[in-house]
Amino acid sequence: MEEVNLIVMIEVMPGKRGTQLDAYKRLKPLVESEPGCLKYELFCDAADENKFVLIEKWASQAALDAHDISEHMLAADALNPTFRAGPARVIKMASVKA
């Protein structure tokens, strides 16, 4: 099985940075306890406090698929439009072998 790497680019509405951070803090332990989660880490743009990048690494596509339909992710997805400036941009990355 090949690992799945995601870069998720997120922009929140002005004044909603704290809501994004609270959501991440709540979700992080739940996501990291999921089978196949290898990394789930949020970074903020140093120049724009409303922009974030979430780095995810999954052991397999099946693990990511299960994550996407987990109860906590479905609940989070329902709330995202209340504080995000638009849909997240998800980039699926392949590892480069040297």
Where does each model-flagged region fall?
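Glycine-rich beta-strand-turn "strand-cap" elements at beta-sheet edges
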Residues: 2-4, 41-50, 76-98
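Short, flexible segments with low predicted structural confidence
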Residues: 2-4, 19, 35-37
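Short, well-ordered beta-strand segments in beta-rich or mixed alpha/beta enzyme
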Residues: 4-11, 41-68
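Short flexible/disordered coil segments
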Residues: 8, 70-71, 96-98
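Short, surface-exposed ligand-recognition loops at beta-strand->loop->(often short) alpha-helix junctions
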Residues: 11-20
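An amphipathic, aromatic/His-enriched active-site/gating alpha helix that lines ligand/cofactor pockets
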Residues: 26-39, 57-91
